[in-house]
């Protein structure tokens, strides 16, 4: 549909689920081999020429190996480059094991001015996030999974530009903010809490550090007890973002449910349960914090 779109691959076309694109549009695909820094450099050059390049690979390889290039050659120059970091978190890195699970990427990218961060909650939302990223100017980082995550959204639901979608509105005992592929678990936890007489609001945050957090602030104002759940290190992810908004706008208690250690190899769903992301564990943490 657009002649300006380019896909830049550091030997990661399969990981990005972009093999059909490379085969159908060979003139819009550049293979750089296992050279993440080079891939970002190439993308920066293409963006300087007016094209819209997408660079994708495992999120840790992208944000750690090419950190300087993402910062200086794209962020500092505010170039129109889009990044897709796949296999994010415990739920995204099942097949390759602990060396390919990454839960620090949001902390890294959130330190770069000019970047917008998209955190889709399921494969369909990832598709719509890519479409939206192509239509906005400036650097965008999309935190993607493996394509094996639980479907929550309707497949035709657009990626919310407001940065938030409220899924459950049971009450104001607490607000549960979800981020990424734990959304189905957070919604199940909200249902469990309702059965126990604790009425919460549950929402999906799909844009971090966006330019207009007004809709997020409205939902934050529903309760003085805010909980964040994200498949990321406890530092620099959703918890840090909501804490910042609370400190700067409307103080409230923020309880962060996130990773505090490195992960381990194993089936993604079992790991998520083991590291505190089961609906039962989330609900128990809310009950404990509320003293109920």
Language-model segments: which ranges?
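Thiamine diphosphate
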Residues: 1-143, 145-292
């Amino acid at each position: 549909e657009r002649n300006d779109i380019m896909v830049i691959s550091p030997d990661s076309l399969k990981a990005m689920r972009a093999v059909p694109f490379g085969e159908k549009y060979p003139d819009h695909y550049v293979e750089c081999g296992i050279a993440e820094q080079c891939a970002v450099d190439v993308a920066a050059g293409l963006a300087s020429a007016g094209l819209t390049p997408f660079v994708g690979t495992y999120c840790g390889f992208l944000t750690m190996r090419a950190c300087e290039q993402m910062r200086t050659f794209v962020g500092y120059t505010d170039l129109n480059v889009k990044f897709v970091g796949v296999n994010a978190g415990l739920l995204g890195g099942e097949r390759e094991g602990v060396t390919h699970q990454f839960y620090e990427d949001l902390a890294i990218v959130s330190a770069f001015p000019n970047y917008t961060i998209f955190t889709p909650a399921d494969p369909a939302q990832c598709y719509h996030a890519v479409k939206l990223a192509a239509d906005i100017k400036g650097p965008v980082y999309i935190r993607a999974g493996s394509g094996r995550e639980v479907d929550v959204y309707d497949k035709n639901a657009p990626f919310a530009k407001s940065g938030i979608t409220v899924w459950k509105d049971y009450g104001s005992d607490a607000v549960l903010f979800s981020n990424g592929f734990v959304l189905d678990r957070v919604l199940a936890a909200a249902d469990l809490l309702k059965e126990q007489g604790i009425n919460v609001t549950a929402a999906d945050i799909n844009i971090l550090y966006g330019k207009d957090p007004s809709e997020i602030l409205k939902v934050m104002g529903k309760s003085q007890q805010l909980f964040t759940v994200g498949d990321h290190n406890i530092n620099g992810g959703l918890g840090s973002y909501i804490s910042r908004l609370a400190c700067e706008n409307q103080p409230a208690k923020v309880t962060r449910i996130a990773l505090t250690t490195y992960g381990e190899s194993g089936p993604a769903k079992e790991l998520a349960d083991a590291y505190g992301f089961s609906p039962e564990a989330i609900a128990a943490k809310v009950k404990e914090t509320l003293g109920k």
